[in-house]
Amino acid sequence: RGDELAERALDNRMREITLKAKRGTIFDRNGRELAISVSTDSVYAVPAQIEKSKKEREVAQKLAEVLNMDEKEIYDRITRQVSFIWIKRQVDLETSQKLRELDLEGIGLLEESRRFYPKGTLASHVLGISGIDNTGLDGLDLYYDQLIGGTDGKIVIEHDAVGREIPEATHRYIPPVDGSSVVLTIDETIQYILERELDKAVEQRQPKAACGIVMDPKTGEILALASRPNFDPNRYNDYPAGNRRNFAVHDAYEPGSTMKIVTAAAAMEEDVVKASDRFHCPGSIKVANRRISCAGGTSHGSMDFTEVVEHSCNVG
């Protein structure tokens, strides 16, 4: 019985702090960084220390000013009966400096890692997003989460009744294991060109959505992939959730005109037709008991075979 009580007492004195692993970097095919991890500070509180100082209201007020948070919300957090609680995660450098200068009793900063996408909106639908806890939520950051997420570590500290660390007491440090990096088939330059041209098309045509894919026909590698509307994964909460939908892979499409190039290539390879052969399009053609029309029912007139493919002519 005595051993059991001693073990319980020790458990009550132990505080465990999770150390988040750094996510692996996502590179394009040429080694250019598309998604990286950067260090940032997060604000935490040890309520027992604040209670001992009798300055709960003062601490809440000063934190609210620096963190731009509701004072009551902070007060409720720092007066909870817990040994450790987050106040605000991943604050900027200026905020960290202000908090260090305030040196508030029971308030501390813990270095964490957050995801950063240095190219902004570029390849956002490919890369996806990561949440506040540094876990993948969408795109490749979600698909490869186990690979690039790493393994979190932790610090276990023994503290006294008011939450202060006990010198030379029981401590345990398990370091985090950072995630592996990933190299994509995506080419940043080709991705930029695709997105630039896609934006032009969207501006001209005003569609509800648009997407584009560039593939190496010899290997099947995807060199670029983009979807519109777009978003910045660094601040994805500022955009409608629908902007994150990747129309290039999430939606099903009838093959339609995309198969014409296959038929055309086969015909040219078998010498059934040459690029210079000419065709006349009156706007429609009767096949068996059906009449097939070109888009919009308009006539393309006289064209060579290259123009037939260019205009996606159903008659030609």
Task: Label each PLM-derived region with a short phrase.
Residues R1-Y236:
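Periplasmic/cell-envelope proteins involved in peptidoglycan metabolism and beta-lactam response
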Residues P175-K218, P233-G316:
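Active-site loop and adjoining helix of the penicillin-binding protein/serine DD-peptidase-beta-lactamase fold
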